[in-house]
Amino acid sequence: MCYNVDNMDFDKEKRNQLIRVVIVDVISFFAVIFMVFVLVAVVKGWRLNRKLEFEQYGMVQAESLPTGAKVVADGREIAETNISKLLSAGEHEIVLKKDGYDTWSKKISITAGKLLRLKYPRLFKQSRETEVLATEKDLSFFETATNHRAILYGLKESPKFKYVTNLEGDTTTSEFDVTNYTSFVSNGKFTGRLKKIIWNENSEKAVVNLVSGEVSEWLLLNFKEAAKSVNLTKVISGYTDKDIEKIVQEKRLEAKEAEAFTKAEKAKNGYVISEVQISDGQATRLMVLIDGKIREVNLNEKIIYETIVTDVAKFSMYGSELAFVKKLNADKKFVISIFKLRDTGEIKIDEVDESVGLNQIFVNLTEFYGEKYLNTVIGQNLRVYNTDDYPNHDSENTNLNLALEKTLEVSPSEFYTSANGEFFMGVSGNKVMLVNLELMELLQFEHNNNTIRQLDYYLMFDVVDGKMQVYDFDHDNQRTILEKVADGFDAVINHNNRYLYYVGTSDNGLQIKRDKLF
């Protein structure tokens, strides 16, 4: 028998090569698995601590205004803002400091594998440049725009409101005379007062509610084109009413009959406006509560669209959703519901006995990080619901996820959504209630008096004994930053964070001032 030695060696080498390939593939496979495992662990915050033990850390993101503040964690300087830093789970003290500025500090709780954002710290320059923009004998109101780009203020008994823009640089002040748009001007004197103001997105328009005694008027003020301003209370009854038009079409009335019928129906309606929300960025469309009905009004086309919901006592709006309280007299109860525009009907959230007064019921909407939130307050009971999207009226399951339920220390007199949509906030005298949606927690605290406002989206202020006290939304970092400040007026840090606008006191009267922050 003969063997081919060359063939045997070749087969053996081929088998060995195949074995090597398999071994390499197996090692590579497990190496990839191991690397993925390590990377996932790193991303989730796992580290080897000083005791050579694996420990899952959490992350804190610290920002500040101005940037470049030194970050001290538990007495050790770790970096400058803006930074992201891993910290062990548990309690830590964070201090931010910068030369020439005051200090900010907070005790934080780090959760393993979680991110904590500190995006709101603000340091105030200790020596600031102050500029007097105007000196006025007396002010009736001083209101700042939601986007922090404009100011509207008025002098007592003067129908000429002052509109201030370009807050980031050389300010521009123009007069807006309301004489032609309200009946609350007599012999050249404004006899009403500003009760409420709702700004549009670019702060070039605002819906204002003026009152005089028991009489109320709703106006749309166009600050750039005054001639396009309108007294909604006076003109709304003259708009095309789609509810009446629909009945005319159903009855198939002839032109003269339709005209007479429309006139008679309009005479029956009071067209009483009790609430207004701006439903588009340019304020050409408004969502209005008219005679207890929520209806959209097109100002350009002068149309009142068909009724969306009836028997409404109060409502709020965010995006394309409405939340409202209905008063059902026959059933002696209130019903809290939501409605998605262009849906076929409303979704009931809760029922409330009429023994609970309407002034103790609040509904608010917002959207935060892509998630939608509904807040209800009934007396001292607070609830927050969340969802990716509200269900449709005909959905099989219309229940919402109850994210938070708490009992408030007192019944609030006001409850609303903050300007940036990140908080639900309420007040009752000097008590403040705030729901932080990011952490889904309720904060309740007291301050020195009843006038508490927001200075920016995260900073609140109060005026006590002529001094402006500021504090974070959670009531930490209370500091006195100004003296000789007039109480009862708004104040604001403008949109690019360069200036602080406020009303100061002087021997010559009240002064519109601004401080340069950095």
Model-derived regions: residue spans:
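Short N-terminal helix-initiation segments at or just after the protein's N-terminus
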Residues: 8-12, 37-43, 361-362, 402-410, ...
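Short loop/turn and low-complexity linker motifs enriched in small/turn-promoting residues
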Residues: 3-161, 197, 264-270, 276, ...
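Generic "edge-of-domain/loop-turn" microfeature
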Residues: 67-69, 78, 92, 101-103, ...
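Surface-exposed loop/turn elements that mediate protein-protein interactions on large endomembrane-trafficking
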Residues: 128-134, 160-187, 211-269, 289-308, ...
